[in-house]
A protein has these predicted regions:
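G-domain G4 guanine-recognition motif of GTPases
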Residues: 1-4, 134
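A residue-level signal for conserved active-site and pocket-lining positions in enzyme catalytic cores
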Residues: 29, 172, 210
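Generic detector of well-ordered alpha-helical packing
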Residues: 67, 134-136, 206-210
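Mg2+-dependent endonuclease catalytic cores in nucleic-acid-processing enzymes, primarily RNase H-like
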Residues: 83-202
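Charged alpha-helix within mobile-element recombinases
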Residues: 195-219
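Acidic two-metal-ion nuclease catalytic site recognized across multiple nuclease folds
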Residues: 215-229
Length: 229
């Protein structure tokens, strides 16, 4: 990058470019406009550090949901799943994925899972924000409002789903690529890493969507008054 005029006008511009995800950095910093999104360019499992305990105190924590209401049937052996990602921002500025769920459930069971999960999250991490996606249109608004009502008494926010899945994932991917993300060891790790490494070419991206939205929530959240360990 040799635009000296721009660097003089904005000395922080180069640092901002270096903080982008690999694909965007290749385009804007190195002028490589031939690069295309492909599996392995956003996430690799060796970019994450797997830990067994929290390395620092939690500043903000959220569980984001990616919703589906599909069950496994002979005609649909591998449907989209309802997925959720519990992520926290730590006092040291890093991020940790604490838990990921991925289930093929009907609508009634999805609602029960959301309530039970919110109760378990609050018991373990106290002030957890539950993030519900809102699809465009009236049906999306009605579903989000219904789920928010179902979770009355919990800290709930809704967000309208906009932009491509790649655009939504890039801020999280940038932090992962710069070594700022950890994963709590768990039985769900393998399936999570498999899906992330296949993004955006893989058949399913439910966990990627949930993780991207959870990252957005904790990255923007105000710090807690009281930190928890």
């Amino acid at each position: 990058f040799d635009n000296k005029v721009l660097l003089k006008a904005d000395p922080g511009y180069l640092a901002s470019l270096n903080a982008l995800s690999l694909v965007e950095k290749e385009r804007l910093l190195r002028g490589n406009w031939k690069i295309r999104p492909a599996a392995g360019l956003y996430f690799k499992r060796d970019m994450f550090r797997i830990v067994h305990d929290l390395p620092d105190k939690i500043v903000s924590v959220a569980r984001a949901w990616d919703l589906a209401a599909t069950t496994i049937t002979p005609n649909r052996p591998d449907p989209d799943r309802t997925a959720s990602c519990l992520m926290a921002r730590l006092r040291n500025g890093q991020y940790i994925i604490l838990d990921v769920q991925r289930r093929a459930l009907n609508a009634s069971d999805v609602r029960a899972l959301m309530v039970n999960t919110a109760m378990a999250d609050r018991a373990q991490y106290k002030n957890v924000q539950t993030v519900i996606p809102q699809d465009p249109g009236q049906a999306g608004k009605d579903q989000a409002a219904s789920l928010a009502s179902l979770l009355a008494g919990f800290r709930v926010s809704t967000h309208t789903v906009t932009g491509s899945k790649i655009t939504r994932a890039e801020p999280f991917a940038a932090q992962v690529q710069h070594g700022a993300a950890m994963v709590m060891a768990g039985a769900w790790n393998q399936a999570f890493f498999d899906e992330l490494e296949g993004f955006p070419d893989a058949l399913h991206d439910d966990q990627v969507d949930a993780a991207s939205d959870a990252f957005k929530a904790v990255a923007r959240s105000h710090d807690w008054t009281a930190l928890i360990s």
